[in-house]
From Swiss-Prot:
Protein name listed in UniProt: GTPase Obg
Region (Disordered): 461-529
Species the sequence originates in: Pseudarthrobacter chlorophenolicus (strain ATCC 700700 / DSM 12829 / CIP 107037 / JCM 12360 / KCTC 9906 / NCIMB 13794 / A6) (Arthrobacter chlorophenolicus)
Record localization: Cytoplasm
Gene3D superfamilies, sorted: GTP-binding protein OBG, C-terminal domain, GTP1/OBG domain, P-loop containing nucleotide triphosphate hydrolases
Domain OCT residues, every copy: 363-447
Functional description taken from the UniProt entry: An essential GTPase which binds GTP, GDP and possibly (p)ppGpp with moderate affinity, with high nucleotide exchange rates and a fairly low GTP hydrolysis rate. Plays a role in control of the cell cycle, stress response, ribosome biogenesis and in those bacteria that undergo differentiation, in morphogenesis control.
Boundaries of every Obg domain copy: 2-159
Gene name linked to the record: obg
Length: 529
């Protein structure tokens, strides 16, 4: 099972924004509280962040689909929805982010470096945010928009100062194990090293990193062997060390022919343009500082071979070191030579002026409308496609099940000038209008409808509870009316009291009692009998 992966295709998508809320405020003694629908929360972002604890892209090889959380919907009482949580994906130092077509999007170098791979969608506005003097009680809200979604390629390019290059079984892994604390897999068969190994070397006051790159063969620049899979790990290195096998038993190989083949492959390999220097030029691999390490001189034949080829290599301008990973012969001298090259490269970088990307301000043109209309033909019928950030975003925010929301969209498009531009382009009633690309919304254009006002049974943005409220009594008027009612009740009670004292009600009651006949009791009638 693979434990090291340096190239993956990652499918990322930001969270969808929450929908706005349609709500009317309800509170005691406030029957006309007005709209109080809150805004939806924004969707979460997907961020790539450099983490030194991460050394491989293996996790994304097994789980390539990553999605941030969505934003929460808005609620009543002006409560906004919860924003979606940001999804942070740790990547190794030296990860290059590319698009599907190979365009470099970001080069992540340094602890904590971040890149937003997919931004979350914004949340929709609630009806409280949409209210105005003309639209006092909106009966609709805006929908949240989906987050960005893209397929990106992650490539890991090792961060090292020196790269060890050479044929398989030349002893590169043995050298890095002898010079540092790295413990790569070492065996006596070709292509034992299948992943780059990094080791830290201390030479005097200079501390640097060396990379053990898997063996290269003829045609590696064209993809043969491990080819491009590991040549890219050499691109960041300031210098190269050719590790030549002086103890090879193959009859058709020798250090000089091995060096010629490796140099040819390095010359053919095209370095990524993202590694250009301060002058904007890329330094080819075969033009960088190079050292030659004649390895395995501890063998009798190896020592003789090293002494035989050394004059020829020095005549070509190489600094040659006879080393042995087994006996550690010559490793100290090789380490200090590497440190000298690394220090010179670092000093050159510090002395170079900082590369500053100028900020270009491009003001919007006076006649810029924020949209454009493209005329197309579909089934021999004209089709007008409206493109632009604003109209496309407005369509995504519209709830087409709500007539008032559709009318609001029509108003916005009319104010933007879409209808006027359609007239200029020769659009006729009944023509098809599409807002957006292939996934856009299709309309049958009817210019006689004034911004969709006829779609509503009542004026848009109004509430019958708020209509004709100009004659509503004020609080002082209400208190006066209440006092008048109290005074009227007190006057009525006083009048009744005056009538009672005058005996009007008493005489009438006494008269009715006198007019009633007196009934004899049963006892009296019994006695008479």
């Amino acid at each position: 099972m693979a434990s090291f992966v340096d190239r993956v295709v990652l499918h990322v998508s930001g969270g969808t924004g929450g929908h706005g809320c349609v709500s009317v405020h309800r509170e005691k003694f406030k029957p006309l509280g007005g709209p109080d629908g809150g805004n939806g929360g924004n969707g979460g972002d997907v961020i790539l962040r450099v983490d030194h604890q991460t050394t491989t892209l293996l996790d994304y090889h097994h789980a390539p689909h990553r999605h941030a959380t969505n934003g929460g919907p808005g609620m009543g009482d002006w409560r906004g929805g919860k924003n979606g949580e940001t999804l942070v994906l740790p990547v190794p130092d030296g990860t290059v982010v590319k698009s599907k077509d190979g365009t470099v999007l970001a080069d992540l170098v340094g602890e904590g470096t971040e890149y937003i791979a997919a931004a979350g969608g914004p949340g929709g506005l609630g009806n409280a945010a949409l209210s105005s003097q003309k639209r006092r009680a909106p009966g609709f809200a805006l929908l949240g928009i989906e987050g960005e979604s893209s397929d990106i390629v992650l490539e890991l390019k090792s961060i090292a100062d020196i790269a060890l290059v050479g044929f398989p079984s030349a002893g590169k892994s043995s050298l890095i194990a002898a010079m540092s604390a790295a413990r790569p897999k070492i065996a006596d068969y070709p292509f034992t090293t299948l992943i780059p190994n990094l080791g830290v070397v201390q030479a005097g006051d200079v501390r640097f990193t060396i990379a053990d790159v898997p063996g290269l063969i003829e045609g590696a620049s064209e993809g043969k062997g491990l080819g491009h899979n590991f040549l890219r790990h050499v691109e960041r290195c300031a210098a190269l060390v050719h590790v030549l096998d002086c103890g090879t038993l193959e009859s058709d190989r020798d250090p000089l022919s091995d060096l010629s083949i490796i140099e040819t492959e390095l010359e053919k390999y095209a370095v990524d343009m993202s590694y250009a220097g301060q002058d904007g030029e890329v330094v080819p691999l075969n033009h960088r500082p190079r050292l030659v390490a004649l390895n395995k001189v501890d063998l009798p034949d190896g020592k003789d071979m090293a002494e035989f080829v050394r004059p020829e290599l020095e005549s070509r301008g190489y600094r040659v070191f006879e080393v042995s990973a087994t006996s550690h012969e010559g490793l100290r001298q090789l380490g200090f030579a590497m440190a000298e090259i690394v220090k010179a490269a670092r000093d050159a970088v510090e002395a170079a002026p900082p590369k500053v990307t100028p900020t270009v301000l491009r003001p919007r043109a006076v006649n810029e409308t924020g949209f454009r209309i493209r005329r197309e033909e579909k089934a021999h019928e004209p089709l007008f496609r409206v493109l632009g950030d604003k109209p496309v975003r407005w369509v995504k925010q519209t709830d087409f099940t709500n007539e008032e929301a559709i009318g609001y969209l029509a108003d916005r498009l009319a104010r933007l000038g879409v209808e006027t531009e359609l007239f200029k382009m020769g659009a006729k009633p009944g023509d098809t209008v599409v807002i957006g690309e292939d996934d856009g919304v299709v309309f049958d254009w009817e210019p006689t409808m004034m911004a969709g006002a006829e779609l509503l049974a009542s004026p848009r943005g109004t509430d019958i509870r708020f209509a004709d409220t100009g004659d509503r009594p004020t609080r002082s008027q209400k208190r006066e009316e209440q006092q008048e009612r109290r005074d009227a009740k007190a006057a009525a009670r006083a009048e009744l009291e005056a009538e009672r004292k005058a005996g009007i009600w008493t005489e009438s009651v006494s008269g009715r009692r006198a007019a009633q006949p007196i009934k004899e009791s049963g006892l009296d009638s019994g006695d008479e009998s």
